[in-house]
Amino acid sequence: IQTFFLLDVIACVSPIGIFLGRIANFINAELVGKVSNVPWSVIFPMTDSLPRHPSQLYEAILEGLVLFLILNLIFFKKNYKIGTCSYIFLIGYGTFRIISEFFREPDAHLGYFFNILSMGTLLSIFMVITGLIIAKFFYKKHV
C-alpha cells in the first residue's frame, strides 16, 4: 500500500475524531471561547460566569464536518490523485484552526506570542505551510 494513499485515507476519517473531540470539549467546558455578547453565547458552568463564544462548536463544524465533506468529495472523485487529501487536510485544518482561534481563549500558561498569535495559530501556520510545500511537490510530480 502506498504511503500517501494510506495518509489520504487517514486524512479522510480524521475529521470525525476531531468533531467528536470538540463536542466533548464543549460538554466538558474545556477550551472555552472569548467573552462575547453574541446571542448564541454560552455561560459555562464552573468558569467565570461570563457569556463566551462556543468556540468548540465552531471548531467541530469547520475542522470536523466541513473538512470531512471536502476531503471525502475529493477522495471519491473519478480523477482523484494520491496525496491530494493529505495536503488538503493540512491546509484545511490549519486554515480552519487559524479562523477559530480568533474566537478561542489562548491556553492560560502560554498566552499570546507577539501579543497577537496563540500557540494554536502559530502551529496552524506551520501546518498550512507544510501542506502547501507538499502540494507543490505533488503538483510538480503530476505536471
Give short role names for the model-derived ranges.
Residues 1-143:
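A feature for loop-to-transmembrane-helix boundaries and adjacent hydrophobic helices
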